[in-house]
Design a protein with these regions (language model features):
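Catalytic-core regions of glycoside hydrolase
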Residues: 1-138, 148, 152, 156, ...
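Solvent-exposed, amphipathic alpha-helical segments
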Residues: 98-101, 141, 145, 227-238
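Histidine-centered catalytic/metal-binding microenvironments
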Residues: 175-267
Length: 267
């Protein structure tokens, strides 16, 4: 039955790229109601949230919303459009560029899924101002790692850097609702950084390139810091003071390098 309180005239499917509710029929869940979804047949907007609390880090669910928006447009009767609901939006610019192109079509009533291979090639060229096969390959790796929803479904937003966490031997997160789980292959992201650097002389005058390069390098450093923290914990537990001291120095140097990369990012 309908709640006794006033029913909203429209809804935001707030985190639809990860946990869509527009097609929820279980009344025990947000948006769900017996006998029908779409918030009891109320106009609603498919939203991308992505960022919680301004957390830094490369993270997104590209394939989810590229497919999800098209599927919703074909199946839903009350979808009113798309929107973004991030708690901060100063990182991962590719997400927003792509998100708003998902409904850019000659026939709005017949949306088609974007060809991501073609889209990424065009994106790299227009963002960096030149063709670059290595930069495109780097983007493919980002799509397969940090922007792959199969690897980024933990709690809220991007994996947090252990550098931001309270010091400890076992670090699971830097904040209450965060996580520090990096479940993609970290070596692949290092390869993406190498590929971006391959055409540095060709692309260095592009502000977009410099921004993306700094963000990728910062994420690589964050991932590396996580590995050193684990080694430090192991050295501490084994009582190897010399090894712990050596690893600590390297860990601190990673923090300095990450600070340098953050300083280079022109937001």
């Amino acid at each position: 039955c309908l709640p006794k309180t006033a029913w909203p005239s429209d809804f935001l499917d707030l985190y639809a790229e990860k946990t869509p509710h527009w097609n929820e029929t279980n009344p025990g869940y947000y948006g769900g109601a017996e006998g029908g979804g779409e918030f009891l047949n109320t106009p609603w907007v498919y939203c991308m949230l992505n960022n919680f609390g301004g957390r830094l880090g490369l993270h997104g669910h590209i394939d989810n919303y590229v497919e999800g928006i098209v599927n919703a447009s074909k199946q839903a009767e009350h979808m009113a459009g798309i929107g973004i609901t991030p708690e901060a939006s100063v990182n991962n610019p590719v997400l927003y560029d792509l998100f708003f192109e998902t409904i850019w079509a000659d026939d709005g009533n017949n949306l088609q899924k974007i060809n991501l291979d073609k889209w990424f090639k065009n994106y790299v060229t227009r963002r960096y101002g030149a063709d670059s096969d290595s930069a495109y390959q780097a983007m493919e790796i980002l799509h397969d790692t940090v922007y792959n929803p199969a690897y980024n479904m933990k709690v809220q937003g991007a994996p947090e850097s252990v550098v931001n966490a309270r010091p400890g031997l076992d670090i699971g997160a830097a904040s209450t609702w965060g996580n520090a789980v990096v479940d993609y292959d970290k070596k692949k992201l290092e390869k993406a950084a190498e590929l971006l650097l391959a055409d540095y002389d060709k692309l260095k005058n592009s502000a977009g390139y410099q921004y993306d390069l700094a963000n990728v390098l910062e994420q690589v450093l964050s991932n590396t810091a996580q590995e050193y923290q684990k080694k430090m914990a192991a050295a501490f537990r084994s009582g190897d003071a010399e090894e712990f001291s050596t690893l600590s120095d390297k860990f601190l140097s990673i923090i300095d390098k990450a600070d340098d990369e953050r300083a280079d990012i022109d937001e």
